[in-house]
Amino acid sequence: MTEIIDGDAVAAQLRADLTGAVETLETAGVTPRLATVLMNDKQASETYVSMKQQDCEEVGIAAEDVRIDPEASADTLFDTVAELNAREDVHGILVQDPTPDHVPDERVLSAVDPAKDVDGFHPENVGKLVGGTPRFKPCTPHGVQKLLAHQGVDPDGAEVVVVGRSNIVGKPLANLLAQKAAGGNATVTICHSHTDDLAAHTRRADVVVAACGVPELIDGDMLSGDPVVIDVGINRVDADTEKGYELVGDVDYDSAEAAASAITPVPGGVGPMTRAMLLYNTLAAASEQTGVAVALP
């Protein structure tokens, strides 16, 4: 019988385990603080920021919400980030996507102090990750690693197919899983929109990670040998519901569940883990900046 990987439950346990690190910091006179900068008026971003704040409050991390008018200049955003960089009481900084079109994405990635870049996307931190000495593992890839570990899946020697090559999930996850380290040593194939015969790759995989942003692309016919299926996607599609839509992943859940040994649902799979790993990185950042050693799960 296929096992449903409950990301909500795993994330809840991780948050509980993180409270020890918070207590260690507090005992040393350090209140870990995460500042989130929001420069858009999208409801999805508002909801996500609110959920992050609730997570912070649950474990004892101070959450600071900084809002900037989407019509403001790009310099307004960068000046705000510079002020947060300079504050010793702020340990983690997150600029919530998306930012307005007039704000250069590459400049946003480079604006946050690498030591406070808890998303792990600053070029310096990307380089450290690729070099095998990550300061912060990007939240979603790290969350996927934690889910696999919770499931008892050791990537060492496994065939892993990552469908998607984004800088946020696909590429960093492939790098993490291939590294010569715990949670790595997998043989990783990255597939994407130009891959010929995608199913030929997914059918030979022990683990399939779907992170391509295409609703229900991966179905049961594309799986073989009872793989573990991790669905990173979350897509809003039209549906005959009260809201007029429903959320689906990049995996056709019903058919894939029948062909998999274990699978993550959408929602309630990877999403909660992404938020939990943001807390993890914030505590790691606070520890690094203050010199207070903490034990992280």
From Swiss-Prot:
It comes from the Archaea. The keyword Amino-acid biosynthesis applies. InterPro entries: Aminoacid_DH-like_N_sf (IPR046346), NAD(P)-bd_dom_sf (IPR036291), THF_DH/CycHdrlase (IPR000672), THF_DH/CycHdrlase_cat_dom (IPR020630), THF_DH/CycHdrlase_NAD-bd_dom (IPR020631). Signal peptide: none annotated. Pathway: One-carbon metabolism; tetrahydrofolate interconversion. Keywords: Amino-acid biosynthesis, Histidine biosynthesis, Hydrolase, Methionine biosynthesis, Multifunctional enzyme, NADP, One-carbon metabolism, Oxidoreductase, Purine biosynthesis. NADP(+) binds at G164, R165, S166, S193, I234. GO terms for molecular function: methenyltetrahydrofolate cyclohydrolase activity; methylenetetrahydrofolate dehydrogenase (NADP+) activity. It catalyses: (6R)-5,10-methylene-5,6,7,8-tetrahydrofolate + NADP(+) = (6R)-5,10-methenyltetrahydrofolate + NADPH; (6R)-5,10-methenyltetrahydrofolate + H2O = (6R)-10-formyltetrahydrofolate + H(+). Its EC number is 1.5.1.5, 3.5.4.9. One of its GO terms (cellular component) is cytosol. It holds the Pfam family THF_DHG_CYH_C. GO terms for biological process: L-histidine biosynthetic process; methionine biosynthetic process; purine nucleotide biosynthetic process; tetrahydrofolate interconversion. Catalyzes the oxidation of 5,10-methylenetetrahydrofolate to 5,10-methenyltetrahydrofolate and then the hydrolysis of 5,10-methenyltetrahydrofolate to 10-formyltetrahydrofolate. Homodimer. PANTHER family: C-1-TETRAHYDROFOLATE SYNTHASE, CYTOPLASMIC, C-1-TETRAHYDROFOLATE SYNTHASE, CYTOPLASMIC-RELATED. Belongs to the tetrahydrofolate dehydrogenase/cyclohydrolase family. This is Bifunctional protein FolD.
